[in-house]
């Protein structure tokens, strides 16, 4: 949900709602994304952004979206984009979406990583367009009580038969959050340490699906240690 319209909720037709939809807000970001990019670069952190290609008109604006992604890469060094909100409901939409992926990949010399969210809608998945990046496989939240580490590991294990594990993103959450939702469940995430959770998805691309500032000191130290081993 965003504020492009009075009531928010714009998930396609972005350019019709606001021609400068993907331009950084001039008051909130008077220098564009330069301060964020500079801060990240100074700490050796690669910058990534969420991006939703415009699905309206069977991806009529696919070239405009591709140019936006390339501009963000060239201007700010954003080399990772999570592509979300995609609706591939016709063959024409699929063809144009593939053209977007091809254009960004070719013109960046494969230096831009495209993470395709495949959690909803009709989208590319395990058997198509895998060469263009990685797959964001699932959404899980302790807020809703639907995150179970053993299920995440099982999904990774079963899908690895068809997709190289390193091409998929699998999540680990802060095990100390929302423990009351799981009560006495012996498989609750709160019964694991953070480094154990990281190790359970280490064969894939581990996704720290959390606010890092909310980690307890001990879990933060354990993650720091195991991430050092992973690197």
What does each model-found stretch correspond to?
Residues 93-96:
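Short glycine/threonine-rich loop-to-helix capping motif typified by GTGT followed
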Residues 98-231:
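Active-site-proximal substrate-binding groove within the catalytic cores of carbohydrate-active enzymes
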Residues 1-81, 85-91:
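Aromatic-lined carbohydrate-binding/catalytic grooves of carbohydrate-active enzymes
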């Amino acid at each position: 949900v965003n504020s492009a319209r009075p009531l928010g909720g714009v998930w396609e037709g972005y350019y019709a709602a606001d021609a400068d939809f993907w331009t950084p807000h001039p008051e909130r970001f008077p220098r564009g994304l330069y301060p964020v990019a500079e801060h990240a670069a100074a700490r050796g952190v690669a910058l990534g952004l969420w991006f939703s290609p415009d699905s309206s008109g069977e991806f009529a604006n696919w070239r405009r979206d591709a140019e936006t992604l390339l501009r963000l890469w060239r201007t700010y060094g954003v080399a990772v984009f999570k592509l979300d909100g995609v609706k591939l409901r016709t063959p024409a939409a699929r063809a144009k979406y593939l053209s977007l992926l091809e254009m960004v990949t070719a013109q960046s010399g494969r230096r831009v990583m495209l993470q395709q969210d495949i959690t909803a809608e009709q989208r590319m998945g395990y058997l198509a367009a895998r060469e263009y990046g990685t797959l964001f496989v699932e959404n899980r939240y302790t807020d809703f009580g639907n995150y179970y580490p053993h299920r995440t590991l099982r999904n990774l294990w079963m899908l690895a038969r068809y997709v190289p594990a390193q091409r998929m993103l699998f999540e680990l959450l802060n095990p100390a959050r929302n423990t009351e939702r799981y009560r006495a469940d012996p498989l609750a995430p709160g019964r694991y340490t953070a480094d154990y959770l990281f190790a359970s998805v280490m064969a894939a691309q581990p996704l720290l699906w959390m606010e890092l500032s909310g980690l307890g000191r001990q879990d933060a130290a354990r993650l720091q240690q195991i991430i050092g081993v992973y690197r």
